[in-house]
Amino acid sequence: MLAASFSGPVVHEVAQADPQLATPQHKVRFAVCGMSHDHIYGMVGAIQRGGGELVLAQATEPDKVAAFKKRFPDVRWAANEEEVLHDSSIQLVLSSKIASERAPLGVRVMRSGKDFLSDKPGITTLEQLAEVRKAIAETKRIYGIMYSERLEVKAAVKAGELIHAGAIGRVIQTINIAPHQIHQGAGDWGGASGRPDWFWNDTQYGGILCDIGSHQVDQFLYYTRSTQAEVVASQIANVAHKDHPHF
């Protein structure tokens, strides 16, 4: 980040992240509907830390279901999506389905009277964006997207706090370099296996700028306190994976 108030020598300091709230301030009953990406574990953890109670889960991939059951052995399982949507006791639905399927699910969730939290990218086409905006306007429900790089990384959270407190002056430029491994390491925000077939298809995962670049756009807007942005140039290339022409 480049700030507009540099003066004097640079002083190296360690900024401590604020401790997490010991007691959640809110309570919410939530469900998981679709877990194609392992980001779902970090999403569940974030909601639980905020006072959420995981009461229901639904997914179709056997390996993902087995892993989730091992992590959350007491959760109740729904037979299908409709069971989740028709459960009036649920206030919020989380999903890390295949990226192109998240927005349509979110629209159905909102129209069932529930709020929705999607893994990123939460929307993959302009047509989906229009449908989501329409559903929000008509239902007054929340369509949230978990941008974990800003919301779950302690350094990023602290950076936001310092910026908004005026500690480094006005941010006038942001630069972000975000390499992404093909085979991700273990962890709630990464995943412990290679990319599934859908992750090589740009119509399903949204393309690299939508998938990864959405993180950076979110951060650029937040750190500069902007509400609008214009993309003036972009470039992509498939350098090392010619066997996946739609990557």
Specify the residue positions occupied by each region the protein language model found:
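N-terminal Rossmann-like dinucleotide-binding module
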Residues: 2-72, 192
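Predominantly a Rossmann-like dinucleotide-binding segment in NAD(P)-dependent oxidoreductases
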Residues: 38, 142, 151-244
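Short, Asp-centered acidic motifs that coordinate Mg2+ and/or phosphate
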Residues: 56, 91-92, 144, 173
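Short, conserved SAM-binding/catalytic segment
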Residues: 68-75, 132-136
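Short acidic low-complexity segments
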Residues: 76-86
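Short loop/edge segments at beta-strand edges and connector loops
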Residues: 79, 118, 145-147, 233-236
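Beta-strand-loop-alpha-helix segment that lines the small-molecule cofactor/substrate pocket
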Residues: 92, 98, 103-151, 166
